């Protein structure tokens, strides 16, 4: 055949293929129109974390035996465990424990392999700071209990204000019957 005719045929095939791809993507876009929105208004609405969410690590100083298993199983050797050997009781005494959350990958190995369960993952995910050195948590900061999402003051006020609006709407729409 002539090269010009084959060129037009391949151009026509490419045009049909491109139209098919655009049509498929348009159908995909239209299939998402009936779904609920996923975006939340972050400071006022907080996402509910799943059951095994890996957030900030909680540390219980009294349970730790300074075995350093958490350091050995960590892929980046992150936890810093300072201890000294007490000769009179023949055991290690923990002096300091710290984790730098700026480097932590939240894999959960330290929590999973801890023999005394002194480490646990919390649902706390708000670790933003202006200085990366503030992400280095010592044992005091790690032992701080997490703030639950439902106990947050801003969330409670928003939830209560919407309930009061709903209650007002119900009371204005309902009739009251009084006995005389």
Swiss-Prot record:
Annotated Gene Ontology cellular component terms: chloroplast thylakoid membrane
Reaction it catalyzes: a plastoquinone + NADH + (n+1) H(+)(in) = a plastoquinol + NAD(+) + n H(+)(out); a plastoquinone + NADPH + (n+1) H(+)(in) = a plastoquinol + NADP(+) + n H(+)(out)
Listed cofactors: [4Fe-4S] cluster
Chain sites annotated for binding [4Fe-4S] cluster 2: 74, 104, 107, 110
Membrane topology: Peripheral membrane protein
Cofactor note text: Binds 2 [4Fe-4S] clusters per subunit.
A GO BP entry: photosynthesis, light reaction
A Pfam family matched in the record: Fer4_7
Annotated [4Fe-4S] cluster 1 binding sites: 64, 67, 70, 114
Signal sequence extent: none
Localization per record: Plastid, Chloroplast thylakoid membrane
A GO MF term: NADH dehydrogenase (ubiquinone) activity
EC number(s) reported in the record: 7.1.1.-
Boundaries of every 4Fe-4S ferredoxin-type domain copy: 55-84, 95-124
Keywords: 4Fe-4S, Chloroplast, Iron, Iron-sulfur, Membrane, Metal-binding, NAD, NADP, Plastid, Plastoquinone, Quinone, Repeat, Thylakoid, Translocase
Function, as annotated: NDH shuttles electrons from NAD(P)H:plastoquinone, via FMN and iron-sulfur (Fe-S) centers, to quinones in the photosynthetic chain and possibly in a chloroplast respiratory chain. The immediate electron acceptor for the enzyme in this species is believed to be plastoquinone. Couples the redox reaction to proton translocation, and thus conserves the redox energy in a proton gradient.
Summary of subunit composition and partner proteins: NDH is composed of at least 16 different subunits, 5 of which are encoded in the nucleus.
NCBIfam families xrefs: ndhI, NuoI, PRK05888.1-3
PANTHER family (UniProt xref): NAD(P)H-QUINONE OXIDOREDUCTASE SUBUNIT I, CHLOROPLASTIC
Family in the record: Belongs to the complex I 23 kDa subunit family.
Protein name as annotated: NAD(P)H-quinone oxidoreductase subunit I, chloroplastic
Taxonomic source organism: Agrostis stolonifera
């Amino acid at each position: 055949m002539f090269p010009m005719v084959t060129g037009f045929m391949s151009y026509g095939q490419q045009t049909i293929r491109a139209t098919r791809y655009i049509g498929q993507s348009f159908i995909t876009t239209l299939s998402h129109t009936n779904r609920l929105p996923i975006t939340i208004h972050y400071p006022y609405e907080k996402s509910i974390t799943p059951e095994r969410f890996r957030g900030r690590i909680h540390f219980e100083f009294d349970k730790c035996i300074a075995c350093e298993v958490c350091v050995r199983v960590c892929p980046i050797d992150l936890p810093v465990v300072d201890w000294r050997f007490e000769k009179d009781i023949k055991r290690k005494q923990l002096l300091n424990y710290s984790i730098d959350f700026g480097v932590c990958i939240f894999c959960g190995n330290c929590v999973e392999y801890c023999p005394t369960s002194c480490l646990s993952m919390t649902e706390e995910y708000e670790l933003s700071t202006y200085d990366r050195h503030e992400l280095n948590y010592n044992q005091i900061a790690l032992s701080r209990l997490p703030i639950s999402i439902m106990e947050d003051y801003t969330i409670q006020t928003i939830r209560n204000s919407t309930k009061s609006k709903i209650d007002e709407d119900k009371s204005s729409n309902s009739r009251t019957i009084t006995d005389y």
